[in-house]
């Protein structure tokens, strides 16, 4: 019984708020610029009053203290950050090349995970014409960097005129007849 009364009260409040908003239509655009500006200013002021009235009519209840969100926030507030160990100052070096890799592996296993050096995947490779994060050679298409594989520069004007100075790119389906 109490739930139905609350629902009817909520519907009555919503109808009242809707009626208040309908009493404030957007001003029609006849008149001078000053008149239109004043109408917009008065409508904006009236709108602020309606919003304040609607907020006083319908207030949102506070969520109960035992809500799952509140419990999750309390758990997050209870977390602490542990002290991180100091990084090692020197790594042991072995003189033998066969034991070198094994010694490094043992050193990395003994270090905490946060101090093991990890190279980013997006670091540029040492070889020219290789894409980042890839071991495949890049085939430059027409209109690329302007050089062929031997480092000779290509002129796009000569290519368009039909006098080819660069060899065709393999695997792209472009040949002299299609140009």
Curated annotation (Swiss-Prot):
Q: Which UniProt keywords apply?
A: AIDS, Host cytoplasm, Host nucleus, mRNA transport, RNA-binding, Transport
Which segments show compositional bias classed as Polar residues?
91-102
Q: Which GO terms describe its molecular function?
A: DNA-binding transcription factor activity; RNA binding
- According to the record, the residues making up region (Disordered) are 24-44, 82-102, 141-179
Short sequence motif named Nuclear export signal and binding to XPO1, residue ranges: 71-82
Would you kindly state one Gene Ontology biological process term found in this protein's UniProt entry? mRNA transport
Q: Where is the composition biased (Basic residues)?
A: 34-44
So which domain of life are we looking at?
Viruses
Q: Where found, per UniProt?
A: Host nucleus, Host nucleolus; Host cytoplasm
What InterPro entries does UniProt report for this protein, alphabetically?
REV_protein (IPR000625)
Describe its partners and assembly state. Answer: Homomultimer; when bound to the RRE. Multimeric assembly is essential for activity.
Function of the molecule? Escorts unspliced or incompletely spliced viral pre-mRNAs (late transcripts) out of the nucleus of infected cells. These pre-mRNAs carry a recognition sequence called Rev responsive element (RRE) located in the env gene, that is not present in fully spliced viral mRNAs (early transcripts). This function is essential since most viral proteins are translated from unspliced or partially spliced pre-mRNAs which cannot exit the nucleus by the pathway used by fully processed cellular mRNAs.
> Record's domain comment?
The RNA-binding motif binds to the RRE, a stem-and-loop structure present in incompletely spliced viral pre-mRNAs. This region also contains the NLS which mediates nuclear localization. These overlapping functions prevent Rev bound to RRE from undesirable return to the nucleus. When Rev binds the RRE, the NLS becomes masked while the NES remains accessible.
The identity of this protein, by name, is: Protein Rev
């Amino acid at each position: 019984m109490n739930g139905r009364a609350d629902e009817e009260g909520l519907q009555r409040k919503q109808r009242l708020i809707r009626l208040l908003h309908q009493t404030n239509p957007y001003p029609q655009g006849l008149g001078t610029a000053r008149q239109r500006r004043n109408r917009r200013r008065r409508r904006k002021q009236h709108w602020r009053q309606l919003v304040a009235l609607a907020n006083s009519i319908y207030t949102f209840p506070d969520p109960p203290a035992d809500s799952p969100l509140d419990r999750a926030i309390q758990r997050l507030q209870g977390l602490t950050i542990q002290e991180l160990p100091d990084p090692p100052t020197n790594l042991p070096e072995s003189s033998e090349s066969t034991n070198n890799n094994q010694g490094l592996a043992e050193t990395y296993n003994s270090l905490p995970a946060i101090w093991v050096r990890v190279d980013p995947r997006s670091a540029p490779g040492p070889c020219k014409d290789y894409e980042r994060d890839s071991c495949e050679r890049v085939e430059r298409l027409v209109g690329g960097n302007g050089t062929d594989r031997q480092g000779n520069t290509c002129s796009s004007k000569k290519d368009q005129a039909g006098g080819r100075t660069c060899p065709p790119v393999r695997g792209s389906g472009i040949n002299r007849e299609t140009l």
